């Protein structure tokens, strides 16, 4: 995407409209600031279950109707783009692969990477639009000294979404605008109320859009036609202590729903997908100090050349924890926390910060206790 050459025209902005209040207010703010806005909603699934009463997700038919109504009220062009085939290939199929390999995927991060900030940026460029705008609570700024684009936390700490945006590249950040980054959610709802938007009081989406009821194992069986067989629960010594209903149904750190009576609380500590076993143990077994990551994207720096002090999150909305990050291969890093962390899980993202700036992040591939690492 090239920068605007004709300074006499107003810059164009593609607004990624989910049908929720955040993207609607983002559209209004951009229009207020003089941008020619075009509203776009991505159709990602054909699953009509997302319209089930009481389930708050995104991309349903009701959401499309809400987005269209807001666009009409703002008098801006609006289209629905069908990305269902690519969404299945890049998001749903990967989601299933990661679970079947024993990990815990984060499809919302993949959707941002492959759909919102890839497909929509290319569509915007093809249609002469300068920016893609979303309703994420994060900030994009340019470092005057280095010229690098930076991703920073949203000012509303409770709504900050920088964690799910760590994959943004320099080229993408140059053409992304996040107008809600400096606002609090209460301010956003107040604007929507003032403008009379139909979704001003709409609940935030809370679930994976293609698994609105949260039963991901049932979704996987329905989608693939597979049946995930029962297997053995093992204790940390390898002794069988029960029977589980399929290893994919359990996540690291899980306590509820195990159906085990062992005299003390136990948690899922490990899974062996080839053997179809799930290891359970005391909560102390969940704590690890070392995290290895790959598929790394650096934002604030071009590359990691030596150890750096950082704070880090291994899950969404976690309080950041102090750590030191070290280079590890051409596309990876090793992160050593100052204190052991509860249940860092392969497949999840680990995102690194310096202050309110995202340094970069990657996908967790392995974890270990400090005593098992020889540096």
Name these PLM-found stretches.
Residues 373-375:
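Conserved small/polar residues in nucleotide/adenosyl-binding loops
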Residues 21, 133-370:
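AMP-forming adenylation/ATP pyrophosphatase catalytic core
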């Amino acid at each position: 995407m090239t920068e605007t050459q004709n300074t006499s025209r107003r810059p164009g902005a593609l607004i990624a409209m989910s049908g929720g209040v955040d993207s609607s207010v983002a559209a209004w703010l951009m229009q207020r600031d003089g941008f020619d806005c075009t509203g776009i909603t991505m159709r990602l699934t054909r699953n009509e279950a997302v319209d089930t009463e009481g389930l708050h997700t995104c991309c349903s038919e009701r959401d499309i109707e809400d987005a269209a109504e807001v666009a009409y009220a703002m008098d801006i062009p609006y289209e629905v783009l069908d990305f269902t085939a690519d969404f299945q290939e890049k998001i749903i199929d990967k989601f299933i692969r990661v679970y079947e390999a024993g990990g815990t995927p984060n499809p919302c991060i993949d959707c941002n990477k492959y759909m919102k900030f890839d497909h929509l940026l290319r569509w915007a460029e093809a249609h002469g639009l300068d920016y893609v705008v979303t309703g994420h609570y994060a900030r994009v700024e340019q470092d005057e000294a280095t010229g690098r684009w930076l991703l920073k936390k949203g000012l509303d700490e409770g709504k900050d979404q920088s964690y799910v945006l760590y994959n943004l590249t320099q080229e993408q950040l140059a053409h992304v605008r996040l107008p809600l980054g400096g606002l609090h959610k209460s301010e956003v709802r107040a604007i929507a109320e003032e403008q009379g938007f139909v979704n001003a009081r709409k609940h935030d989406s809370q679930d994976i859009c293609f698994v609105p009821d949260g039963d991901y194992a049932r979704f996987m069986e329905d989608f693939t036609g597979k049946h995930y067989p029962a297997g053995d629960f093992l204790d940390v010594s390898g002794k069988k202590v029960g029977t589980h209903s399929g290893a994919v149904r359990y996540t690291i750190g899980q306590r509820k729903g195990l159906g085990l009576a062992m005299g003390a609380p136990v948690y899922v500590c490990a899974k062996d997908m080839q053997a179809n076993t799930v290891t359970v143990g005391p909560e102390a077994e969940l704590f690890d100090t070392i995290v290895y990551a790959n598929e790394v994207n650096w934002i604030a720096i071009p590359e990691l050349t030596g150890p750096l002090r950082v704070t880090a999150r291994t899950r969404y909305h976690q309080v950041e924890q102090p750590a030191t990050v070290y280079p590890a291969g051409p596309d990876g890093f090793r992160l050593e926390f100052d204190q052991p962390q509860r249940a860092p899980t392969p497949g999840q993202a680990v995102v690194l910060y310096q202050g309110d700036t995202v340094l970069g992040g990657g996908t967790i591939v392995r974890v270990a206790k400090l005593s098992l690492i020889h540096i």
